């Protein structure tokens, strides 16, 4: 049974033709990886390209005023190389005939770069893990997911990892 989905985007009614490009931002944490099966499943089902994105903090975040900036350059290069290698490993693990993937490594403020990549790459969906923080923890640390949701040019699917359950 075929259905047509209509959605309203900034006052305009459009016909939804499915996902073509899905963005999965990762910080390589187990929490972020909990969202990966959702992104992969949606990409396979829609025959969409899956973009794996990692955002490195800006180099300025690492520079200590008492140290020469040049001393940090080799460390930053190693960090960039390690992140690129990790993205490639993830991409290789997902390789298959029914999934097209693409990796992007960038640097800056995470939520800014996620939104920027979604716009630049014309992504139809962002699949993003969330901590689900509330109260004081949320007020102090903020939320990458919340900032992405507020600014994203496309829908955002947030995935909260399973909670720990005691056997008691």
Describe each region flagged by the PLM:
Residues 1-17, 31, 92-126, 163-168:
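Structural beta-alpha unit
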Residues 125-147, 161, 165-168:
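Glycine-rich, Arg-bearing micro-motifs that act as flexible, cationic patches
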Residues 11-70, 99, 164:
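Small/aliphatic-rich secondary-structure junction motif
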Residues 67-71, 120-121, 144-145:
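Short, hinge-like loop/turn segments at secondary-structure boundaries
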Residues 70-85:
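A short acidic, glycine-rich active-site loop
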Residues 51-53, 102-106, 157:
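General small-molecule cofactor/ligand-binding pocket signal
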Residues 35, 62-65, 115-116, 138-140, ...:
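Short, well-ordered secondary-structure micro-motifs
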């Amino acid at each position: 049974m075929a259905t047509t989905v209509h959605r309203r985007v900034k006052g305009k009614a459009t016909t939804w033709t499915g996902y073509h490009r899905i963005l999965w931002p990762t910080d390589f944490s187990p929490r972020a990886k909990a969202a990966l099966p959702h992104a992969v499943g949606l990409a396979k089902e829609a025959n969409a390209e899956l973009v794996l994105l990692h955002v490195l903090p800006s180099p300025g975040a690492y520079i200590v005023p008492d140290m020469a900036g040049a001393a940090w350059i080799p460390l930053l290069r190693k960090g960039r190389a390690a992140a690129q290698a990790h993205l490639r490993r993830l991409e290789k693990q997902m390789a298959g005939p029914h999934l097209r993937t693409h990796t992007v490594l960038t640097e800056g403020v995470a939520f800014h770069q996620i939104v920027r990549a979604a716009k630049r790459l014309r992504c139809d969906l962002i699949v993003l893990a969330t901590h689900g923080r509330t109260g004081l923890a949320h007020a102090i640390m903020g939320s990458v997911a919340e900032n992405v949701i507020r600014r994203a040019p496309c829908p955002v699917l947030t995935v909260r990892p399973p909670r720990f359950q005691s056997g008691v």
